[in-house]
Amino acid sequence: MEAGYAEIAAVQFNIAGDNDHKRQGVMEVTISNLFEGTLPAEGGIYDARMGTTDHHYKCITCSHQRKQCMGHPGILQMHAPVLQPLFIAEIRRWLRVICLNCGAPIVDLKRYEHLIRPKRLAEAASSQTEGKQCYVCKVIHPKIIKDSEDYFTFWVDQQGKIDKLYPQIIREIFSRVTYDTVVKLGRSKNSHPEKLVLKAIQIPPISIRPGIRLGIGSGPQSFHDINNVIQYIVRKNLLIPKDLQIVRGQKIPLNVDRNLQTIQQLYYNFLLDSVSTTATQGGTGKRGIVMGARPAPSIMRRLPRKEGRIRKSLLGSQVWSISRSTICGNSDLHLDEVGYPISFARTLQVAETVQHYNINRLMPYFLNGKRQYPGCSRVYKQITQSVHDIEGLKQDFRLEVGDILYRDVVTGDVAFFNRQPSLERSSIGVHRIVVLENPKISTFQMNVSACAWYNADFDGDQMNLWVPWSVMSRVEAELLCSVRNWFISTKSSGPVNGQVQDSTVGSFLLTRTNTPMGKNVMNKLHAMGLFQTTQTDPPCFANYSPTDLLDGKLVVSMLLKQTPINYQRAPTWYSEVYAPYMHYNKQDISTQIRNGELIEGVLDKKAVGAGSSGGIYHLISRRYGPQQALKMIFATQQLALNYVRNAGFTVSTADMLLTPEAHQEVQEIINELLLESEEINNRLLHGDIMPPIGLTTHDFYEKLQLNALKFPDRILKPIMNSINPETNGLFQMVATGAKGSNPNMIHIMAGIGQIEINTQRIQPQFSFGRTLVYYPRFALEAQAYGFICNSYIAGLTSPEFIFGEMNGRFDLINKALSTSSTGYANRKAIFGLQSCIVDYYRRVSIDTRLVQQLYGEDGLDARQLETVRFETIMLSDQELEDKFKYTGIQSPLFEEEFSRLKKDRDKYRQIFLNIENFNFSQLLTDVRQVPVNVASIVKNILLSSTSGVLPFDEKSILQKYTMVKTFCKNLPYVFINNIQERLQTPIPVYLKRAASLMRILIRIELATVKTLNITCEQMSAILDLIRLQYTQSLINYGEAVGILAAQSVSEPLTQYMLDSHHRSVAGGTNKSGIVRPQEIFSAKPVEAEQSSEMLLRLKNPEVETNKTYAQEIANSIELITFERLILQWHLLYETYSSTKKNVMYPDFASDVEWMTDFLENHPLLQPPEDIANWCIRLELNKTTMILKSISLESIVNSLRAKHPNTYIMHSVENTASGIPIIIRIYLRESAFRRSTNTRMATDEKIAVNLVDKLLNSTIRGIPGIKNANVVKLMRHRVDAQGKLVRLDNIYAIKTNGTNIFGAMLDDNIDPYTIVSSSIGDTMELYGIEAARQKIISEIRTVMGDKGPNHRHLLMYADLMTRTGQVTSLEKAGLNAREPSNVLLRMALSSPVQVLTDAAIDSAVNPIYGIAAPTLMGSVPRIGTMYSDIIMDEKYITENYKSVDSMIDML
C-alpha cells in the first residue's frame, strides 16, 4: 500500500504545560555535567539521547549521525514550580479575577459575554475586584500587588496582612479553576492557567546549542553559552529541597527563598533576553546574567530582528554559491547578456547530469579537469553515491550515464543577476553568460541600456550573480525571470529600456535631415558598415551602387522594416521654448513611421528613449513581443553608436562659452534680479512689508526674495544666440533628451542663481545674523544668502563654492536619514499586501476572503496596456454628428449607432468629470490606457492588404455594423468562457462595467463612417485580433498582485521621500518628507493629521469668478480665535472703582479717559456690583482686523455671549494712527465660586485659566480651518451645445485644516463639491466607499507624475478598507485584517509577543499566502504553483521509450 501525501492545512498555537513537556521529552536531566570522559554524561545536559553534533558518536534516540539528527528535547523536573516568564501578565490577570480560596470567578461572567473571546479576561481583570466577596465560598478577595523590585513576585494584601504568593501556591490556586470558567473568560481549554506554572521545564535539543571539540579527551572545546545557563538552572534546582511544601502565609528559610528567586530569574534568562548584570533593570525587577563580556543568550533571542531565524533563514533565500563584483558597461553585449570574468567562471560550478545525449559534450570538461578552462572540479558517482575530486581520480575512472559533473561556467549558461535593494521584481533578472577570456578583467559587464531594470549605474555599484544548478531550476529561471518579462514595467505600464545618452544622440544625428555640412547622407559602403555589429539579418544593398548616397532615415528604415510598425508623434527635439531662437527643418518637427519606414522626423528620447511609453519599442513589444523589442533596442543602439564613432560627437568647453554680447546680456539680467532684491530689502528696512495672515514678516520677506531671485525664461535668449544648435554638443544632448536639462545648461553657461536648502535661502547659522565668515553680521545683499552670480564655466568664488557644497551635504544627509524609514515602510507594505492573490475568477482574495471582485476593476495586467485617444470626448454635439453619423443609408440601425456613440461620450464625461470635481489636480482628458489599440490594428490590417480600396455596398455595411454590435455585447464573456458565451448566460454587472471603456473605444474606432473601406473578412480579422489581445491582457491566475502593488508604490514613494525637503524645528535636515505618506498609510485620525487640506467650491456661479468676493468668504470661514487678534495682553490685579474711575497701574493711566467715555456712551452697560479684583487688559492688532474684516463690535459681542461672568469695556474702533484698540475685561466674583460657594477672589490660578479660555474663544469661522486662501482652478464643463469647455477663471477656497461638516453648513459653499484631503474626515461623513476613493486620490496627489498605475492604488485602497473601517498598513492594521495569520504577523515584527498572544488565545493559523507556507517549509500557491498538475504515472510508465528505441524509430 502506497503512502498518502498531504499538506499542512493549519497550525494551532497552545501553551505547553507539564504534560506536554513530559510527552515530548526523551530523557530527564538530573545532573549538570557535560561529558564523562569522551562521551556525554548520561542524564547530563549533553546526553546523547537529545541528539549529537559530534562525529565521534551517534544519537541514541534516532541512531543518526550529526547531519541527519534533528535533535530531541529533554525535560528537567523542578523541585519547586516556576512561573512561565512569557505569561507573567496573564498570570496577574487570572489572580485578579478568580478566588484565591476556591478558584471560582469573583466577577459576573455575564457582563463580558458580549465581548470577543480574546478581550474578556483582560476586561474582567481591569475591573475593581479588590474587596469583592466570592460568590461560592464568601471569602473576600485581596489586593494583588506586583513587586516593584522583582518582576516575578506577587503579594496579596488581605486587610493589611501582606503575604507572598510563591509559584507553588499560585499553581494550587490555578488547579482549582474549572474548564467552564476558563472558556467563559474567553480562553481555550488548552490555555488553562495551571499551565502557566511549570513543574517540568523543557531542555532544548543539542542541535540548537551545539558544541565543538577538537580531538578526543582533553583537547580544546567550545560550547554554546546557553549550555552554561542550563547548567546554572540544574545546579540551583539541586539546592532546593525535593519535597518542599509551601503554605500560604508561612515563612520559609531565607536561603531557600533566594534560591527560588534565582532559579526563576535563570529560567527567564534562558527563554528571554538578558540585558544587564544589575540587581534590577530600570525598576522592572528583571535581573540578568552575562557570559564573559556579553549578555547570556536566550531561546527567544534567536527569533526577532534581521539576523533572527525568521528573517535570516526561514524567509530569506539561500544559494549554494554566489559571486559579487563591481559592474561596468559594455555596449557589445546584448541586453539579456552579462559579461562574466573567466576567473569567476572557473570558481563557480554548475552541476550537470551525464546523459546519453550530452556525454560527448561533457567529456572535454571531464578531461580538462582543473588544469584547463573549461573544466570541472569534482564528480558525483551515482553507483557508489560518493563525490570524487577531479585531481585525485585513478586512471581507470570512467564517466558514466547518471553521474553528476560539476563543471565550470561557460558562455550560454543562464544566471540570476541582482542588485540590492531589490525594490521591484525586475531587480532579479536572468541573463545569458558571456565568459570574458581576458584574465585581467574582474568586473561584471552589461549593456548600458540594461541598467534600468536594476536602477544601476557605473559609479561603483556592485551586483550579485549566481547560477541555478538543476535542469528544472534553469528552465524555470529562463521562463519566469528572463529579463524579457521585465521589459514592460508593472509600475508604469511603459517600457523600461531604450536608448540612453550616447545612443540617443546617435539616433538623432543619424536621422536628422541636414548636417552642418549639408544633407545627412552616406555612401553604400558606410551604410553597410553600420550594420556590422547589429547581429540582425543584414538588409539588401544590391539595388544601390557604390556611388549612391543614402540618407540616415533610409538606413534606419532598413532596420525598422524587420518589425514593421506605424508611429506618429512630435519629437523631444522640437520645443516651443527653443523655436524663437533657432530654425527647425520642417521635416524634423514631427516623427512619422509608416509600415516600418521612417517618412519624416528624428529619433530621440520620445521615440527610442528608455521609459518612453507609446514609443517605437513599446509598439514593437505589443505587436511582436518583448524579445523582439530587446533585439531592436540592441540593433538600433549599435547602428547609432557606429554612426557616432564615424561621424564624431563631443562636448567641449567651446560649447559652454558665451559670446561677449551674450555674457553682457546675462549680467544685465542678473543685475536686474539683484536690484529687485535690494528694493525688497529697502521695503523691509522701512517697514513697508505687510505679510498676509498666517505668515510672519520674516517668512513673507524670504518668500518675496525667492520669487525675485528666480532666473526668468528670457535668460535662455543670450545662451541660444551665442551657440550654434547644429554643432553644439551640450545643447543637442539637452534638446534630444539624452542627458541634462535647461537649468543644467543655464548653470553651466550663464549663472547658478539662488541656492535653496529645505526650500529656503541660506540661513544665518554660522553665527548670530551671519551666514558665512565672508559676510558681515546682518548683511542683506542676495549674495550673502546663497545667490551665485557666476556660472560653472566661469568659476566660483570661495563663498559661492561653499554654498553649493552646503546644498550637496544636505542632500546626502537627507538621503541617509530617509533610507531607514523608507526601507521599513516598503517592508510593511510587502507584508501587508502579500496575501492578496488572484484566483481563478480573477478576483483578489486573502485565502477565502474577498478583496476585489475583479482585479483592478477591469481584470487587466498593468504591463499589457498602451495609451490611446478617445476621439469623441472633446467634440460638441454638432461636431460628433458631422464626424461620426453615417447618412449614406437610411436605416434605424445607424441612428441607433450614433445614439450609442453619444451616450458613450456622455457616460465617459460624467465619470471623469466626477473624478475631476473630487480631486485636487486630476483633470479630465481624452487619453486613457487600454489593452488594445484598435486604431493601430485597423491601420495594420489595411496596410497589409493588397486588394487596395474596394467598393462597398449596403449589405456589407449593415453586416459589419451587426458584427461590431454583437462583438461589443459579448466582450465581457472574455472574463468567463466560451461555453457561457454560447449559452448567453447573464453577465454580472461588475463584468459589464469592467469592459465598458474598451467597448466605448471599439465603437468609436469601428464606427461605420470609419470602416467603409474595410471588407467583412477584414472586419472579422480585426475583431479576432481585438479579442485575442484583450484575452492576453488579462491578469494571470495566481498572480501575487499585492506584492506587485507594494513594489510599484514603494519604489516611487521612496524617491518622493528623498526628493521632499521639509523644514525641521532647527532649520536643518529631518525626516518630515515622509509625513504625508505616513498619514495616508497609517490611517491616522483627523486630529492627528498635520497636513490636511480642503478645497471648497462656491455655490453662486457669479461669486466663484470674482476673486474679491471669494476672498471675503474665505475670511469668513477661517477660524479666528481671540488670540490671533491680540498684540499683547496683561493680567492685572486691581480694584475697580466706579466713582473714582481710576486705575492702579501708572503705565495705563491713559485708559481712564476712554473708560469714562465708554460709560457715558453706553448707559445700559454699567459695571455690575460683583466685579472681582482681576482685570485682563488687551491691545488688538488693527492690521489683522482690517485684513480679516472683523469689527470691534463683533469681537465684543462674541466674547460677551461666550463669557457671561465678565464685564467688558473697550476703546473706540477708529483710533488715530499708532494708537491701539484696547479692551478691558473685568472678571466677576461668580467666576471664582466653587461648589462650596467659598469666595476665591484672590486665586491667581483660576484667573490664569480664565485668561486661557478667553484667548481661545472663537470669534468667527469654522473649527478646524486654520487658514483659508483663494486659489485659481481649472475645470471642465459641458455647454449647451454639448462641447467640453475648459474654464480657467474659477476661484475656490483652499484651507489649511479640515472640517467637512462645518463647511457644509455654510450657505456660500457648494456642499456637493467639497474635497478634503483627510481620509478620516471623509470616512466619518461620507462612509467607507468615499474613504476608499480618497486613499486613491491622495496617493496619486502625493506622487504626482511619478505615481504608479492606478490598479496598484486600488489594491492599497481596497485592502485598507476591506473590513468596513480604514485600517493602516502598520502592525495594528495587519492584526485587524488578518487576525488568524499568526505566522505572517510574526514574520513582520515582534515574533515573541505575537507567539505569546497566539498561545494564550489558542489561535488556529490556516496556511495561506506567502509567509506562512514559507515558514512551514512548503511552497506558496502563487504564480505557476497556483494550479495543481495532475500526472498519470501509469500512462507515462507504459509509454516510456528508451534512447535506443527512439533511435530505432528515427
Swiss-Prot record:
GO cellular component: DNA-directed RNA polymerase complex; virion component
EC number: 2.7.7.6
Reactions listed under catalytic activity: RNA(n) + a ribonucleoside 5'-triphosphate = RNA(n+1) + diphosphate
GO BP annotation list: DNA-templated transcription; viral transcription
Chief localization: virion
Induction text: Expressed in the late phase of the viral replicative cycle.
Compartments where found: Virion
InterPro entries recorded: DNA-dir_RpoC_beta_prime, RNA_pol_asu, RNA_pol_N, RNA_pol_Rpb1_1, RNA_pol_Rpb1_3, RNA_pol_Rpb1_3_sf, RNA_pol_Rpb1_4, RNA_pol_Rpb1_5
Comment field on protein domains: Lacks the typical C-terminal domain (CTD).
Name recorded for this polypeptide: DNA-directed RNA polymerase RPB1 homolog
Species: African swine fever virus (isolate Pig/Kenya/KEN-50/1950)
